[in-house]
Amino acid sequence: MSFGLLNGKRGIISGALDEASIAWKVALKAHEEGARFTLTNAPIAMRMGAIKNLAEQCGAEIIPADATEVGELEKLFTQSQEVLGGPIDFVLHSIGMSTNIRKNREYGDLNYEWYLKALDVSALSLHKMLQTAEKLDAIAEGGSVVALSYIAAQRSFPDYTDMAQAKAMLESIARSYGYRYGKKKGVRVNTVSQSPTRTTAGTGISGFDAFFEYANRMSPLGNATAEECADYVVTLFSDLTKKVTMQNLYHDGGFSSVGISAEIVELLEKKG
Ligand SMILES: NC(=O)c1ccc[n+]([C@@H]2O[C@H](COP(=O)([O-])OP(=O)(O)OC[C@H]3O[C@@H](n4cnc5c(N)ncnc54)[C@H](O)[C@@H]3O)[C@@H](O)[C@H]2O)c1
């Protein structure tokens, strides 16, 4: 069901790699809610080609950009405004990558070049997007920027390694830039801390199935799906959340507020 929440709005959606991507679902939802937007991803991700199907479904243009390259982000914001015919109302940052995780490196055996790369791709890229947008004055008054995070920013999860610091940094950038951009142009900046979700980035983490199931049994509402995340993100892009900014918003079925659930207790009692 469409509510027309984003009628007349222009956006930029990053990170749609394939149908499982959270950004893919956000794009479909934003389209359904009446938005027009451009799609972007790292040039290397384009080779897989799936994004073209999404672009067709949404009537969107694809503008490749490596989110760590300021020059490419300048092109992204400039061309998006040209294609869409005006300033941008919403931006989705849905970007994460850690080579240490991909290569199963333990927290006590991290490669520091990869560590810095993970921070650059997964966190600093949000700052680069915001600073580029501000310098180009590319985001409209009252616009909304959302980045996706994970609760490993607050709590330790052994296999999340350097991405835990990336997410802590991402959330901190959202607060600091949220203050600046809010004062300057009423632009909101928030992070949405999402449940474990079966995507390329998600399932790349070793032990993913176990902690997906653990989170599901801990959360009174169960894990939030990518589609449900898209529903939430769309409200944050809409005019219904005009005074929400500088927040890390949990979208996790209640996981972040639970100490232990009856289900986990029962499971451990059975084992004991
Ligand atoms: N899947 C989960 O369990 C989960 C949970 C909480 C938060 N998140 C976050 O959600 C976001 C989206 O991830 P996803 O789970 O949809 O997985 P995904 O693999 O579908 O998306 C990650 C995207 O990042 C893009 N990317 C990587 N390097 C890039 C670069 N240099 N420039 C531009 N784009 C680049 C990839 O091409 C890909 O499209 C990430 O920030 C992720 O950390 C995921």
Where do the protein language model's features map onto the residues?
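Hydrophobic structural elements of the Rossmann-like NAD(P)H-binding subdomain
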Residues: 13, 92, 146, 189-192, ...
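Aromatic pocket-lining residues of Rossmann-like dinucleotide-binding sites
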Residues: 30, 181, 236
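Conserved mid-core segment of classical short-chain dehydrogenase/reductases
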Residues: 55-57, 63-74, 78-117, 135, ...
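C-terminal helical subdomain
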Residues: 124, 187, 191, 209-244, ...
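Short C-terminal tail/terminal secondary-structure segment
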Residues: 245-272
